[in-house]
Regions:
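Acidic/polar-rich alpha-helix caps and helix-coil junctions
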Residues: 1-72, 84-191
Length: 191
């Protein structure tokens, strides 16, 4: 809320408080697919029970969910694909890029979201990475470029992305790009 209110100081303070309580998503957890409510970095999520979800299975069915071996996932309606321009934002050694799959020689899908064995993957609403990126943006907007970069580097280093060397407006743009790359499909924006 403080970020939206442009209260940069409080946005920084409270994002850091939350970050102190939850770890970042390990690469192993990231690559396992987002379906487990018990993932340590999930601050807020919703488990899909049989009573809540009687037949449509998880909302991840709206994504084209393939399997690692090229098969089709549970109840995939094949509605959401990744644009080539978005996929191109990821460097080859970025662990997040390893989840992209090319289908029909024309579209990308992702293994980021997967159903669990019961076909009802939990839904993530907020992760520690969101707080990290909020803190980095708040720091940048306060002119604390070195602190903002140090915050951003935690995520970039973990994922295998190149560290940002920018300052000012360019650093802010890189923080926003990293937000898009890290949090895509998690409800922060679909376009």
């Amino acid at each position: 809320v403080y970020l939206t209110m442009t209260d940069w100081n409080n946005a920084e303070i409270y994002a850091k408080k939350v970050m102190n309580k939850y770890p970042l998503t390990s690469n192993n957890n990231y690559l396992a697919g987002f379906s487990d409510i018990n993932t340590p970095s999930w601050i807020w999520g919703m488990e899909q029970s049989e009573e809540q979800n009687m037949g449509d299975y998880s909302p991840y069915a709206m994504w084209y969910i393939g399997t690692e071996d090229g098969g089709y996932g549970y109840w995939s309606f094949k509605c959401f694909f990744l644009a080539q321009s978005f996929v191109d934002k990821f460097e080859a050694n970025d662990v997040r890029a390893s989840q992209f799959r090319w289908e029909w020689d024309m579209v990308h899908y992702t293994l980021k979201f997967r159903d669990n064995e019961a076909g009802r993957g939990s839904i993530v609403f907020m992760r520690t990475e969101s707080m990290l990126l909020n803190a980095a943006e708040a720091l940048c907007r306060q002119g604390k470029n070195d602190e903002a970069k140090t915050m951003l580097w935690q995520l970039q280093d973990m994922r295998g992305a190149t560290r940002s060397v920018s300052t000012g407006k360019e650093l802010l743009e890189e923080i926003w790009l990293e937000r898009r790359k890290e949090l895509y499909g998690e409800g922060y924006g679909l376009f």
